[in-house]
Curated annotation (Swiss-Prot):
Plasticins have huge conformational plasticity. They can display random coil, alpha-helical, beta-sheet or beta-harpin structures. This is Plasticin-B1. Belongs to the frog skin active peptide (FSAP) family. Plasticin subfamily. It comes from Phyllomedusa bicolor. Pfam families: FSAP_sig_propep. The keyword Ion transport does not apply. Its main location: secreted. Keywords: Amphibian defense peptide, Antibiotic, Antimicrobial, Cleavage on pair of basic residues, Cytolysis, Hemolysis, Immunity, Innate immunity, Membrane, Secreted, Signal, Target cell membrane, Target membrane. Residues 29-40 have a biased composition (Acidic residues). One of its GO terms (cellular component) is other organism cell membrane. GO terms for biological process: defense response to bacterium; innate immune response; killing of cells of another organism.
Length: 70
């Protein structure tokens, strides 16, 4: 009986160790994906603000060249 009990504990232990390792890897991958998403959102916001700024600058230049008439 004691032998079966020890064997059962060993099997459960050997099953739980890989399970916990998989959980750690999964959480690391999710964190990496979240960081990549955050970085892409920052880049998108930067590009949008640059385009808006360039549009305002060009609009001001064309407005002053044409004498403010469209």
């Amino acid at each position: 009986m004691a032998f079966l009990k020890k064997s059962l504990f060993l099997v459960l232990f050997l099953a739980l160790v890989p399970l916990s390792i998989c959980e750690e890897k999964k959480s690391e991958e999710e964190n990496e994906e979240k960081q990549e998403d955050d970085q892409s959102e920052e880049k998108r916001g930067l590009v949008t603000s640059l385009i808006k700024g360039a549009g305002k600058l060009l609009g001001g230049l064309f407005g002053s060249v044409t004498g403010g008439q469209s």
